[in-house]
């Protein structure tokens, strides 16, 4: 990995606390793409929004569960952020319950498993 790729990787690691293996590869092979992606993500997440940040994080956790129900750590991470920003456990549960019909039981289970871990850790 060249110096530019290393800088992108380190910046991403410090902001997120983790780097997906695919993003590590992109830092190595196409750091310009990672920079453009991160700039777009930072713009979207950083702009003034009518939607409360707690809902944005909750939506992200639901979207991750829909796209990849086995991404437990990522679902949990965004649920934790949402809860820290003011979402209740009940709101988190209801977000996942609301997508049962269009998305299926596996998505609800993925959300419930992540939420259960959080509730258990808080006890």
Over which residues does each language-model region extend?
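Acidic, glycine/proline-rich low-complexity segments that act as flexible tails and inter-domain linkers
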Residues: 1-55, 84, 110-123
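Residues within well-ordered alpha-helical secondary structure of globular protein domains
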Residues: 29, 39, 61-64, 98
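Amphipathic alpha-helical segments within well-ordered protein domains
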Residues: 41-45, 60, 79-83, 93-97
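Alpha-helical scaffolds flanking conserved acidic
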Residues: 52-59, 89-94
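Amphipathic, charged-and-aliphatic alpha-helical interface segments
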Residues: 55-71
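Mid-chain, well-packed structural core segment of small domains
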Residues: 67-93
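Substrate/cofactor-recognition hotspot
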Residues: 98, 103-106
């Amino acid at each position: 990995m060249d110096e530019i790729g290393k800088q992108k990787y380190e910046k991403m690691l410090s902001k997120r606390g983790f780097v997906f293996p695919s993003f590590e590869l992109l830092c190595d092979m196409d750091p310009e793409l990672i920079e453009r992606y991160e700039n777009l993500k930072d713009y979207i997440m950083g702009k003034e929004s009518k939607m409360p940040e707690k809902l944005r994080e909750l939506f992200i956790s639901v979207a991750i569960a829909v796209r990849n129900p086995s991404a437990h750590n990522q679902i949990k991470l965004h649920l934790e952020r949402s809860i820290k920003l003011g979402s209740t456990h009940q709101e988190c549960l209801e977000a996942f319950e609301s997508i049962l019909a269009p998305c299926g039981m596996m998505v609800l289970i993925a959300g419930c498993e992540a939420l259960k871990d959080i509730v258990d850790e808080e006890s």
